[in-house]
């Protein structure tokens, strides 16, 4: 997975509900096909904190998170090539949310579509504007902005109904950058896929849980067959020509078959293929693609501990690489700093000029690359462990120089630090020296 030099693409995954074929064709399959594209670093997170706005059943929350993680892994998302993590495993997200809350305008949040929709519904029913509205629903756009800005995502694939949230994230980022005088955040862009496929449901309308017309992605082969055979069709009998265009059976077939197969299927319908036989062909075509995914899904569901370990490992590495260093910079920017350092700078004491600390990068006989922080008298304050390349060491040095808390000095890549206060003071001098 790349770092800094790639375009960062971040995708949030809802962790409530059971995935259906419409989710698979319209969101899961295209997202996985796009994952790991050259020059792209892909981030996928399970939005379990967001789910708490609507779901307050602990068992359901836990189960849904497992099912959704297993679904994406079964469908081919490779955690060796992309970042897959659970939102609640990255506490810096909620800390950043608070920092953004302190610069977000309430007027902007008042205009959020989800919030306004509930207010309008309450008014139409003659109720209080805020009846049934939690602070979580109202603050949802700020949490979404924190999801995006913590990893400085360049692009966020969303539907048109979500563009407003990306615009809000840009607004919060610009406000923070302006108030605190730095380029702390990249301004994200909404990536709109105009070709998003929508599948018809069992009744011919768009497949949607709200219509109750969905086909679960991982139902059994027998259940899938029953769903397919319950698709509503017209009354034309076998032998009568049938229009492929507008037919739910044909539209579903198109989502799982190639151009040539679809052409042959349309021709067969025009020549009088019966709906019963057409549904048999549709069922076999869908099952041919879904069956191996179903098998992988069932395997993952039998190994929840493996999924847990993978999610925790991914979140831990992302926190160390991106989240903790950025929050250290933001804490420094807003003034959440060590008071001991504040006292040192607030009460200047005349003293002899002392040489600046220095960071030295070098190569050892083992072929690995190291760095150390040395104070003005030549004493080693911090010693790194070995890196595979000078580029890796250099990137880590850049992050290390921004450390403003003792927690940031605790890392597998650093030898234990004896005196964090002295080290933080030395790093502060380096930053002030420019």
UniProtKB/Swiss-Prot annotation:
It is found in: Cytoplasm. GO terms for cellular component: cytosol. The keyword Cytoplasm applies. L-tryptophan binds at residue 147. A motif ('KMSKS' region) lies at residues 206-210. It catalyses: tRNA(Trp) + L-tryptophan + ATP = L-tryptophyl-tRNA(Trp) + AMP + diphosphate + H(+). A motif ('HIGH' region) lies at residues 15-23. It holds the Pfam family tRNA-synt_1b. GO terms for molecular function: ATP binding; tryptophan-tRNA ligase activity. It comes from the Bacteria. Homodimer. Catalyzes the attachment of tryptophan to tRNA(Trp). This is Tryptophan--tRNA ligase. It comes from Xylella fastidiosa (strain 9a5c). The lineage of its organism: Bacteria, Pseudomonadati, Pseudomonadota, Gammaproteobacteria, Lysobacterales.
């Amino acid at each position: 997975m790349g770092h800094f030099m790639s375009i960062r693409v971040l995708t949030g995954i809802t962790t409530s509900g059971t995935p259906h074929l419409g989710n698979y064709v319209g969101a899961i399959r295209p997202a996985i096909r796009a994952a790991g594209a050259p020059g792209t670093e892909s981030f996928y997170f399970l939005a379990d904190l967001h789910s708490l706005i609507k779901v307050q059943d602990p068992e359901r929350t836990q189960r849904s998170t497992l099912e959704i993680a297993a679904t994406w892994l079964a469908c081919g998302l490779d955690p060796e090539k992309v970042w897959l993590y659970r939102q609640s495993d990255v506490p810096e997200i909620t800390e950043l949310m608070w920092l953004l809350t302190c610069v977000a305008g309430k007027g902007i949040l008042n205009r959020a579509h989800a919030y306004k929709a509930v207010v309008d519904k309450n008014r139409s029913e003659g109720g209080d504007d805020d009846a049934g509205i939690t602070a979580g629903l109202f603050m949802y756009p700020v949490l979404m902005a924190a999801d995006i800005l913590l990893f400085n995502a360049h692009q966020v694939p969303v539907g048109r109904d979500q563009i407003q949230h990306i615009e809000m994230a840009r607004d919060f980022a610009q406000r923070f950058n302006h108030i605190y005088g730095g380029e702390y955040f990249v301004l994200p862009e909404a990536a709109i896929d105009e070709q998003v496929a929508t599948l018809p449901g069992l009744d011919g309308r768009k497949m949607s849980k709200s219509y109750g017309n969905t086909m679960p992605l991982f139902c059994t082969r027998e259940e899938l067959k029953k769903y397919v055979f319950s698709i509503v069709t017209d009354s034309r009998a076998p032998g009568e020509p049938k229009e492929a265009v507008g037919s739910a059976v044909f539209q579903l077939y198109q989502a799982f078959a190639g151009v040539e197969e679809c052409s042959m299927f349309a021709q067969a319908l025009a020549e009088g293929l019966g709906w019963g036989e057409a549904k048999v062909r549709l069922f076999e075509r869908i099952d041919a693609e879904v069956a191996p995914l179903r098998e992988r899904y069932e395997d993952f569901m039998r190994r929840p501990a493996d999924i847990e370990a993978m999610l925790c490992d991914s979140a831990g590495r992302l926190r160390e690489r991106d989240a903790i260093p950025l929050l250290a910079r933001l804490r420094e920017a807003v003034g959440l700093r060590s008071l001991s350092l504040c006292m040192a700078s607030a009460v200047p004491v005349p003293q002899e000029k002392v040489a600046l600390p220095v960071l030295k990068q070098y190569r050892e006989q083992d072929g690995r690359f190291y760095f150390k922080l040395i104070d003005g008298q030549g004493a080693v304050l911090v010693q790194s462990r070995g890196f595979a390349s000078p580029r890796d060491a250099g990137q880590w040095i850049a992050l290390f120089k921004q450390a403003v808390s003792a927690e940031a000095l605790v890392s597998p890549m650093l030898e234990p630090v004896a005196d964090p206060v002295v080290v933080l003071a030395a790093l502060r001098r380096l930053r002030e020296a420019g």
